[in-house]
């Protein structure tokens, strides 16, 4: 039995996917049952990395999603539109969907999955998070007997590359970003990466799977890495930390134990933490569950090979079902998505965590005492408060707190910022507790 598929997009990931499908030797035998019937592209004249018959290429994307011979549509276009509309149109024509589009799933997942369940088709998205790291399927299947407590990940290779180079070279953000763009690791407009938006899309998806409820993308608190300086990285190193952009879904971090904390932000993590050694363009995801404890997933988070590997694994899953089932089998609950309720999400002000903060203060007697009093007025307990040195004639003071409610900490900073001796608060970074 041959299963015909159609691809929407033939960029880096699309080309990598076709390369795997055209070279089945030594891979899953199910690959030999797959025929690429159509590939949607913007231009028929553009040079390609892969060899495909001219009749396979088309600029008519709607013809692919409505073709009665095509059983699986692989969406690799990226972006919100027309990707969302084409996915929904394909579902309405009873096509199974494989996608690497985290932005569409994070924002329109409920709409897409409702349509898929209504029409009896699958929407699989292993490639949407973590590139080649198998994390979606383990959360849905292998870890199903666990009560997930937290998911903590380095989910964006661009920002991890930038922070890794800033750490190893002592370089500033702008300098490393420019180098990353020249090497092709960062886009000309890097906002989705460096502002944390890409990682926020991904943690919204993982949280939905891990905690068994829908997640609104706007409920993910999001901060990027533009404000992280070489100075902070150096001080973090002296304190026994490294700085990483973490995406966190935590069922235990807020005052309300029934609500999740969903957040993306630069974070100080101890050097002996499992994620501290995830460097360069690599991704890592640490899942904590009961009774398993901790399990970590690690690998290349982007690129043609890793992402195409995840795409093809989803295609193989669906092909296996099609070739071994009755004509209209019931959806496998381990592959489909059926939850209807939304996860309750706690506001970031209720987060309980530690903080690192750097102050530039006038070099006058009593300034450290005034800082300590300002924190004490709001119940903020300090782990350390030390004067590191001088910058532009100001005393540079670094504070690390014990666990504190974020709202209380921010109130303390507001009071402290009004002190005459406090000239600037350049950095406020959370510390992973």
Curated annotation (Swiss-Prot):
CDD domains: ACT_HSDH-Hom (cd04881). Keywords: Amino-acid biosynthesis, Metal-binding, Methionine biosynthesis, NAD, NADP, Oxidoreductase, Sodium, Threonine biosynthesis. Its cofactor is a metal cation. It catalyses: L-homoserine + NADP(+) = L-aspartate 4-semialdehyde + NADPH + H(+); L-homoserine + NAD(+) = L-aspartate 4-semialdehyde + NADH + H(+). One of its GO terms (biological process) is methionine biosynthetic process. It comes from the Bacteria. Pathway: Amino-acid biosynthesis; L-methionine biosynthesis via de novo pathway; L-homoserine from L-aspartate: step 3/3; Amino-acid biosynthesis; L-threonine biosynthesis; L-threonine from L-aspartate: step 3/5. This is Homoserine dehydrogenase. L-homoserine binds at residues 187, 198. A sodium ion is seen in the structure; a metal ion may subtly affect the relative position of the nucleotide-binding region to influence enzyme activity, and could increase the stability of the enzyme. GO terms for molecular function: homoserine dehydrogenase activity; metal ion binding; NAD+ binding; NADP binding. It is an enzyme of class 1 (oxidoreductase). Gene3D superfamilies: 3.30.70.260, Dihydrodipicolinate Reductase, domain 2, NAD(P)-binding Rossmann-like Domain.
């Amino acid at each position: 039995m041959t299963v015909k598929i159609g691809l929407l997009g033939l960029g880096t990931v699309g080309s990598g996917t076709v390369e795997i499908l055209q070279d089945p030797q030594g891979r899953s035998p199910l690959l030999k049952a797959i025929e690429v019937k159509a590939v949607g592209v913007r231009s028929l004249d553009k040079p390609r990395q892969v060899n495909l018959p001219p009749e396979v290429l088309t600029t008519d994307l709607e013809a692919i999603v409505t073709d009665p011979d095509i059983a699986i549509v692989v969406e690799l276009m990226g972006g919100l539109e027309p990707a969302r509309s084409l996915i929904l149109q394909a579902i309405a024509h009873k096509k199974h969907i494989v996608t690497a589009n985290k932005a569409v799933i994070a924002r329109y997942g409920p709409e897409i999955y409702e349509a898929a369940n209504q029409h009896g088709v699958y929407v699989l998205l292993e490639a949407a998070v973590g590139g080649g790291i198998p994390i979606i399927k383990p959360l849905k299947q292998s870890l199903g007997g666990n009560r997930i407590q937290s998911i903590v990940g380095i989910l964006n290779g661009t920002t991890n590359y930038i922070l890794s180079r800033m750490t190893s070279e002592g370089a500033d953000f702008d300098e490393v970003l420019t180098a990353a763009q020249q090497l092709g690791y960062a886009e000309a407009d890097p906002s989705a990466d460096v502002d944390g938006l890409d990682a926020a899309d991904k943690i919204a998806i993982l949280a939905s799977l891990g905690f068994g409820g829908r997640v609104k993308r706007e409920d993910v608190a999001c901060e990027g890495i533009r404000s992280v300086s070489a100075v902070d990285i150096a001080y973090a190193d002296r304190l026994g930390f490294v700085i990483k952009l973490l995406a966190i879904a935590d069922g235990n971090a807020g005052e309300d134990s029934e609500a999740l904390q969903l957040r993306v932000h630069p974070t100080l993590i101890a050097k002996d933490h499992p994620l501290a050694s995830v460097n360069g363009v690599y991704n890592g995801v640490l899942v904590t569950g009961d009774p398993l404890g901790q399990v970590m997933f690690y690998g290349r988070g982007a690129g043609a090979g890793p992402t195409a590997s995840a795409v093809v694994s989803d295609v193989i899953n669906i092909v296996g079902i099609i070739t071994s089932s009755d004509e209209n089998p019931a959806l496998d609950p381990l592959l489909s998505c059926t939850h209807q309720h939304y996860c309750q999400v706690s506001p970031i002000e209720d987060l309980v965590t530690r903080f690192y903060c750097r102050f530039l203060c006038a070099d006058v007697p009593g300034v450290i005492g005034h800082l300590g009093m300002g924190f004490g007025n709001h119940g903020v307990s300090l782990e350390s408060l030390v004067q590191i040195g001088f910058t532009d004639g100001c005393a540079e003071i670094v504070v690390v707190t014990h666990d504190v409610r974020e709202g209380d900490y921010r109130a303390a900073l507001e009071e402290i910022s009004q002190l005459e001796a406090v000239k600037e608060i350049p950095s406020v970074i959370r510390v992973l507790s």
